[in-house]
Amino acid sequence: MLKTLGASLLLVSGLAIAAAPAVALQTVVTQVDKNANGSMTYHFAVKLDQGETLSPGESKATADFVTVYNFYGLIDGSPKSPGGWEFSSEEFGRTPTLNGYPLVLPLDVPNTPNLTWTVTKPVAAGAQIDGFTATTRVSAMVPGEYAAQVTRQLPAIQGAQGAATKPSKQALIGALPTPSFLADVK
């Protein structure tokens, strides 16, 4: 009985997720350079949905961000950020939280560097931001995962005079897709 209930809940949850629109921030690998010393430099881009913005917040703790988890072999000093972003690397990657509890549960391997870029200037809805890079000593391809915190504008309540739109923080998690061009990297 409990197995049937559990399977039913899992199926309904999966259907609900599949039915929801798949529009949200994406972090993608745009280029990989194989360097003369055998290291690999990864270039990332962040793509925002039309309904999302990135806000610096009142402090780093409240600012929107993107974290790429488990970047094995990170070479110190190699990560670069575009203007309006600040880089950090922590053993436990920054993850969106609410009242101290994680909103998403990425696989975060202990003692493995994570790449976190925190926004320091507002980013408009629908933007694509390029210029995130990091170099690794590892030449093998490893599946990646990312999480992000974004700001979404909730619509005003219809019929309520004077009701304005309200910003809402949202958490995202996704697989870092390996682009097809990586098959050619040797």
Q: At which residue positions do the language-model features occur?
A:
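Extracellular or exported targeting regions of proteins
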Residues: 23-186
